[in-house]
A protein has these predicted regions:
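Conserved small/polar residues in nucleotide/adenosyl-binding loops
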Residues: 141-143
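Conserved N-lobe loop of protein kinases adjacent to the ATP-binding glycine-rich P-loop
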Residues: 30-38
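AlphaC helix of the eukaryotic protein kinase fold
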Residues: 44-68
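Activation segment signature within eukaryotic-like protein kinase domains
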Residues: 117-118
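Conserved short submotifs of the Hanks-type protein kinase catalytic core
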Residues: 84-98, 102
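Protein kinase glycine-rich loop
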Residues: 15-22, 26
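Activation-segment/catalytic-loop signature of the eukaryotic protein kinase fold
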Residues: 80
């Protein structure tokens, strides 16, 4: 786990944790050169599992594939940093609240809003499926 205040690659200052998964932690970071916020996904190369190398290689392949995509509903990958122990994937920071938080705080949303979200999701999936070869997204948890 990277400590808050750490500067990665001489320019990305870690501000706070914004998400966590099985093999990665996502931080909000500030590019100290451009004064711009980014999301930085930290992927530890060694964990406690025997399949760590496979998982890390899979996450790295996903990041390299995402670098080539250009769609307004998908965050751009702008940098991949490998310091030998940890891989950092720097991507667009998209402000807002998670759907889970919106539902917990505000309850069911109006039908028009849900339809608008579904249309945006379908447009992003259509874009992914139109790639050569098609990109099949298996988990919609974090979209």
């Amino acid at each position: 786990m990277t400590e808050i205040g750490t500067v990665i690659d001489g320019k990305y200052e870690i501000l706070r944790e914004i998400g966590r998964g099985g093999m990665s932690i996502v931080y909000l970071a500030m590019d100290t050169h451009l004064n711009k916020q980014w999301a930085v996904k930290e992927i530890r190369k060694k964990g406690n599992g025997k399949n760590d190398e496979v998982v890390v290689n899979s996450l790295l392949a996903e990041a390299n594939m995402m670098k080539k995509l250009d769609h307004p509903a998908l965050p751009r990958i702008v940098d991949i940093i490998d310091n030998g122990i940890t891989i950092y994937v720097v991507m667009d920071y998209i402000e807002g609240e998670s759907l889970d938080k919106v539902l917990n705080e505000y309850g069911a949303q109006p039908e028009e809003q849900v339809i608008a979200w579904a249309e945006q999701l379908c447009e992003a999936l259509e874009y992914l499926h139109s790639q050569k070869p098609p990109i099949i997204y298996l988990s919609l948890i974090h979209i």
